[in-house]
Amino acid sequence: MMVCFMAAVMMMSVGCHKESISPIIPDSPIIPDGALPGLFSVSATQRVYFSQGNLQYQASTNTWRFAEHQYDYVGTQTADGYGYYGGNVSGSDNRSISSTYSGWIDLFGWGTGSNPTLSSSNQEDYGTFVDWGSNPISNGGNTSNRWRTLTQAEWDYLLNTRTDASSKRGTGNINGVGGLIILPDSWTLPSECSFTSGFCSPSGYTYPDWTHNSYTLAQWAQMEAAGAVFLPAAGGRNGTNVYHVGRYGNYWSSTPDDESYAAYFMYFSSYNLSAVGYGSRYCGSSVRPVQDN
């Protein structure tokens, strides 16, 4: 069996620690439909809004939407070989991916904006990138070409290069759902919340460990209103096999690796992060669109 995600280079693992973040007066822009309020630098000259949740697709109605909440993901209800399964979108399972499926899916092969239910394991079927954001997204303005996917360089800039990058990212959980938290450029911590940057190394067999930051739904509502982004660890898909749900997060970039028919993605677990991982294009990963400011 081929391994979907072949490498995750430039890994960074940081022990549990706290870093203070100086409050900055937030921006007051007009927030696009379907977007979160924070602005995030993805290059020296470009800032973006993140969508309100991961991208989802319903084949039976040809409908695209953003997840209702940032912590929502489809996942699967069938355990993988490691015993991992999960998801909180009722009546939906990524294992059921097909052109007629009436549930929702949210793990897509690379560049499948024009063919979101493609589940072939033939690399050549994924040769041309079509951005998922080129489609009308029902709760994201519902017109074409409003949204796009970050490039590999933009993921890297966001997570590693922008001002205070390392102090504005960390793992955690929202009401038990694990994932990666990213803070906006201008950030004021809500008075009833806390945030600890970085990651926790696994201890013994306690893996994954998403307790680095823990939020109730009420606490997360305050964090989100202040601009925080949460990317759930929604796992991956190979054909109709879904794996590592709740253990890893894999988020596509729009950047191909033409020499190997792979593509770049942003990868994280509860204890590390890579902005420049790469893997086979046929492997299903999460998509979190952005809109340019």
Report the location of each language-model feature.
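Intrinsic disorder/low-complexity segments enriched in polar/small residues
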Residues: 3, 19-20, 69-71
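Bacterial N-terminal signal peptides
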Residues: 3-13
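Bacterial Sec-dependent N-terminal signal peptides
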Residues: 12-39, 289, 293
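Intrinsically disordered, low-complexity segments enriched in proline/serine/threonine
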Residues: 25-28, 118, 186, 192
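C-terminal, surface-exposed recognition/capping segments
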Residues: 35-37, 44, 48, 52-59, ...
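A short glycine-rich, aromatic-capped structural motif
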Residues: 37-126, 149, 153-159
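Short, motif-level signal for alpha-helix interfacial/capping segments enriched in acidic residues
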Residues: 126-133
